[in-house]
Amino acid sequence: MHKSLASNAFTLSIFLILFLSIFIGWTQSKLKSEGYFLKPICVKIQSGENINSVSTRLAKLELITSPVIFRIGASYTKKSSLLKAGSFLIPAKSSMLEIIKLITDGGKNTCGKEVLYKIGVTSEKIVVRNFNPNTGKYLETLNFNLKDDVKPKSYIDLTDEQGVRYRIIIAEGVSSWRIIEAIKNADFLTGSVTKISREGSLAPNSYEVGFGSTRESVIERMENKQNDILSKAWESRDLTSPLKTPEEALILASIIEKETGLPEERGLVASVFTNRIKNNMRLQTDPSVIYGLTKGRKVLGRGLKRSELILDTPYNTYINTGLPPTPITNPGKLAILAALNPDKTDYLFFVANGSGGHAFAKDLKTHNRNVNTWRNLNK
């Protein structure tokens, strides 16, 4: 009898092991199988939601075939407790495992409402937009100046809405003073700012931030980004460059950034200043003279006066030979790369051509002819 019981128990164990193996294999297959939904969808996870409520809701949306299997997958991958509040874009035909990964990894919002804070040389704008998962495009719903006395109610209400993404966009050529002042005005950030960052040390870029992030942490990210860009560019520099230090590269890049807004011209403008440095010629660049007058705290908004061109400041490159003592703005990555890897030319001069670009010249005679040509056209 004991042998019979042992035999039955052994048979049952084999059956259970076989059943579990088949069940695990079937479950894994279901978790990895493509979803049946043919269009991407934006799913919002509320703060405090658990895997049970989320799986039930996803099943109602027909994004998953079984909430039970979904929960098993989340438990098996040890992600049941890692749900992140926010809005997440679920691509068409995503498997259950892919969905689990999307709504638990990192917690970075990928769809829904987005607030853009655009900091430019002369403006600070808030743009609110919604992402349409079906078209893959954004629809702008709000656009206003953050300095306005009265903010739109629809913008104020966003502070109580979960899953809203916030992004700060810094344009190239904005001074540190202006960036810091704009960061102080950002009502979705917290904390104080104790100092103005060194000119040139903040990387123009796009930064996603969380609501309530500290201002100091955002500024630190900008500084770290610029340090990273500069150090990598310095390592790949043209070894024939007359620039002796990364700081000198940053100074020249800032001048290039203010002299041209055309990406295709950066290398040419860089070549002019590089050639002038090699020939021990004064740089004679207006933006540096202007910085000596404004320190980046305002836009001059007019041409330089003759008296200003002879005013003795460290930034007057019509009087002083060599680079100014500091950067004159925060240059972008392309300007930094251009400063360290300029085009190979013999150009020593350039003048604005009246259409956003410049006319370049190898000698003073040609340059003067270009100046007269564009002056006559602009009369």
Model-found features: residue ranges?
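Acidic beta-strand-to-loop metal/phosphate-binding motif
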Residues: F350
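Conserved catalytic or metal-liganding residues and their short signature motifs at active sites
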Residues: M1-Q284, P331-L334, A338-D346, G354-K379
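Short glycine/proline-rich, acidic loop/turn segments that cap or connect secondary-structure elements
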Residues: L304-T313, L337-Y347
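Small-residue-rich helix-loop
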Residues: L243-T245, A249, P263-G322, T326
